[in-house]
Structures are given as C-alpha cells and as structure tokens.
C-alpha cells in the first residue's frame, strides 16, 4: 500500500509497495493464491461433513464439559474468519451447541450431561424457518446448526436455525471462482478482473465489523459457555472476551490491509494501461524474489500477446526517452565567406528562358508599330528592332561610363 513517505518521492514505483518489500501486484497474487488454498480446504471440510457425517461426531461438537473441543472449534472459527464470504457461514460450525438438550416436558429441558443442571427454557421458533423444531441434539442429523441465546427476565430463549451445507458450498465456490479470477487478472494485467473479489472483500469486511460490534454490545456465546460450564474454569470471562476481541480486531485490520492492497493493485494496473506513467517493476531491485517474479513475467507476456501486444509497445515507448531535438536558427543561415565564394551568375535563369523572354518582348513592340504588315515583314522587323535595341543599350552604357570618367578628381563622395 502507498506510504506517506513514498508519495513524496519522485520514483512512482515506490508508491505501490506492500509488506515493506513487495509490489502491490506481487502481493495481490500471493494473497490470491493463499485464499485459494484456504477456500479449497474449507470446501473439502464441508464435503466431508455432508457426505460422511460420522467423521465429525456431534457428541463432541461444542460440548460444554470439554474445554479442548471448544478450544478446537473456536480456533477453527478464527481460521475461517480469514476467508472472505464465509464469515457468517462458519459461525454455524463454531458456535457451542448443546448436544444433550432434550424435551423433558412442556416447559423444562435437560441441559448438559448432568441431571442437576435442569433449567427452564422458552422456545421461540420463528415462522420463517420451516425446519425449526425442538429436537434432541444427540440424535440430530448432520446439518450445520447455530443457536442464539439471550437472557430475558430470568429465562433463556433458544432459537434453533438449521442450514443446509450445500448453500455454504455454493457460496464458497463462487468466492473461489472470483479469487481465481483476481489472480488471473493480476498476472495478465487485466484490472477489471480484480473488481469481483474486491467487492466480496468489502462485503466481508462489513460483516466482520458488525460481528465485532455485536460481540461488544451483547452477551456472547463464550460468556454463556463459561457461565454454564460444570468443570473447572481457568480464565475469567472478561479476560477471555478481551482476548477474543483483540484477535477479531487484528483480523479486521488484516482484512482492511488486504482490501487496500487489492485496490492499489487495481489503480496500478489502470495507470499502467491508460497513461503509461509507471515504469516496469524489475525484480533486480529485490533479489530475493527474482525467481518468483520471472515466472510472473512469463504469464504477463502471454497476456500481452493475447491483447495484441498493445502494452508491450507502450512499455517500449515508455522505456526509450530520446532527447528532444533543439532548433537552432543559426544553422539555417549560410556563412558570409561561403556567400562570397558563390559566382555572380550562379542563380541566373537558363539561356532558353532568357531568349524566350526577349523574343516575346520584341514581338510585342513590333506588333505595336507595324500592325498591318504581313508575317514575313513582322519577322524581319523583329530581327532589325532587336539589333537596334542592342546597339542603343551599348551606346547608353558607354555614355554613362564616359560621364563617370570625366568626374573631377577633387570631388569626394559623401
């Protein structure tokens, strides 16, 4: 992500760094691959629970007198919080259930494994859940179930909601597809491919924030578990709540950081495609990642070939920075010595052009004097007139030279 000090530097490449040493594009690819692995594990876990429920016996799931089982499932809940789009679904796997809640009479239930812990409960079954019925949890089918507990005037109210694991598999599969789409877009420099997973991240961040706020404002299931626990308690409910809240806040900060990293990668790809203001990020600056970056460049080159080599041409233009040509007006003007070496008649018109001009002028004069003569007389008169004009010009030139020569020697020009 961009740092405040990096924004003040002149090198634009330092504006898009994450994890102190990675480029946002490399960080996005690593984050996407990690998410793909976690989601594949989560999908495998759901399939095992769906098709082979005996692998996860329900008598050990969330048992109130088994601290190890509860700790294991709460750790599993913390791991699933790292997966976008399943923050709400994984709660059904990790909430502490009550495996031996059975109907004793209309108003009394046996709670836990000890007959001395009989507590009055009031069932509040919502009409929106058709499958919501009071059941014996020890013989319940393999379904993902979550219980919400709350205190109301000295009594506890249990709302049993049953979820189908197929919905969780579908949602996680869509999230996995969008994550693969994001990795493909980051490798092939397609910025629009990052947007679907980015929106999932935004939605998941909002869900986590609401969950943390709900944990702070209401009685949590962890406090209820500690309050009703029959075995020894080694930690206070306040300390445990503080630990869980701290871990949740750290996960929320991590998700926000990953969200900003994906957004910076999107901005980097858009700037690199539209304006070409960013130079290529070379791996020689970070030698530890040279092998990994060489593999990514191979995929990037294949993506550029599919798009018509448009980006490669832009990169070549960006890398080459030729110096601008300066215009010097003195280079266009010839030197004075070169002009003096040019002969006087160097730019004279060709002879045939001069003869044509003189012939046309004499013909005009002859036509003005002898308009009624024949063509033969016109030709003769033209030749005679040309000779006379030449003689007159020579005489005038000699006369001017004689006048210049006869000028007194004591007269000096001004």
UniProtKB/Swiss-Prot annotation:
Region (Disordered): 306-328
Gene Ontology, cellular component aspect: lysosomal membrane; plasma membrane
Superkingdom of this protein's organism: Eukaryota
Sequence ranges on the Extracellular membrane side: 50-166, 216-241
Keywords: Cell membrane, Membrane, Phosphoprotein, Receptor, Transmembrane, Transmembrane helix
Membrane topology summary: Multi-pass membrane protein
Keyword Nucleotidyltransferase belongs to the record: no
Membrane-spanning parts: 29-49, 167-187, 195-215, 242-262
InterPro entries the UniProt entry points to: LAPTM_transporter (IPR051115)
Principal subcellular localisation of the protein: membrane
Protein name per UniProt: Tetraspanning orphan receptor
Gene (name only): TOR
Function per UniProt: Cell surface receptor that binds to human complement C2a protein. This results in inhibition of the classical and lectin pathways of complement activation, probably due to interference with binding of C2a to C4b and interference with cleavage by C1 or MASP2 such that C3 convertase cannot be formed. This infers resistance to complement-mediated cell lysis, allowing parasite survival and infection.
Processing and modification events after translation: Phosphorylated on tyrosine residues.
Subcellular location: Cell membrane
Note: Potential vaccine candidate molecule.
């Amino acid at each position: 992500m961009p740092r405040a000090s990096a924004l003040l530097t002149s090198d634009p490449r330092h504006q898009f760094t994450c994890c102190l040493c990675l480029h946002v594009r490399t960080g996005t690819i690593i984050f996407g691959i990690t998410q793909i692995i976690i989601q594949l594990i989560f999908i495998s876990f759901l399939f095992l629970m769906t098709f082979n429920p005996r692998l996860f016996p329900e008598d050990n799931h969330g048992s109130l007198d088994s601290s190890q089982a509860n700790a294991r499932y709460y750790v599993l809940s913390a791991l699933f919080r790292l997966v976008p789009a399943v923050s709400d679904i994984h709660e059904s796997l990790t909430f502490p259930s009550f495996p031996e809640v059975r109907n004793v009479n209309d108003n009394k239930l046996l709670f836990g494994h000890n007959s001395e812990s009989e507590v009055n409960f009031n069932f509040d079954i919502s009409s929106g859940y058709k499958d919501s019925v009071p059941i014996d949890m020890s013989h319940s089918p393999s379904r993902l179930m979550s219980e919400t507990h709350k205190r109301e005037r000295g009594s506890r109210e249990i709302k049993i909601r049953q979820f189908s694991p197929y919905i969780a598999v579908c949602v996680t599969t869509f999230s996995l597809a969008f994550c693969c789409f994001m990795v493909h877009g980051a490798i092939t420099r397609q910025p629009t491919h990052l947007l679907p997973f980015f929106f999932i991240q935004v939605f998941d961040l909002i869900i986590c924030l609401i969950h943390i706020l709900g944990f702070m404002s209401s009685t949590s299931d962890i406090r209820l578990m500690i309050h009703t626990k029959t075995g020894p308690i080694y930690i206070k409910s306040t300390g445990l709540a503080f630990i869980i809240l701290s871990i949740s806040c750290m996960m929320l900060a991590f998700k926000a950081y990953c969200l900003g990293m994906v957004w910076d990668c999107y901005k980097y790809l858009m700037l690199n495609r539209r304006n070409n203001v960013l130079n290529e990020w070379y791996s020689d600056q970070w030698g530890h990642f040279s092998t990994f970056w060489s593999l990514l460049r191979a995929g990037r080159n294949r993506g550029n070939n599919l798009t018509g080599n448009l980006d490669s041409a832009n990169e070549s233009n960006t890398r080459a920075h030729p110096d601008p040509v300066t215009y010097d007006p003195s280079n266009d003007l010839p030197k004075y010595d070169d002009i003096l070496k040019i002969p006087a008649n160097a730019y004279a018109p060709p002879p045939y052009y001069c003869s044509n001009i003189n012939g046309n002028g004499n013909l005009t004069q002859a036509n003005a004097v002898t308009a009624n003569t024949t063509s033969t007389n016109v030709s003769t008169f033209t030749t005679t007139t040309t000779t006379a004009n030449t003689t007159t010009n020579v005489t005038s030139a000699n006369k001017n030279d004689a006048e210049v020569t006869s000028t007194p020697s004591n007269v000096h020009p001004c």
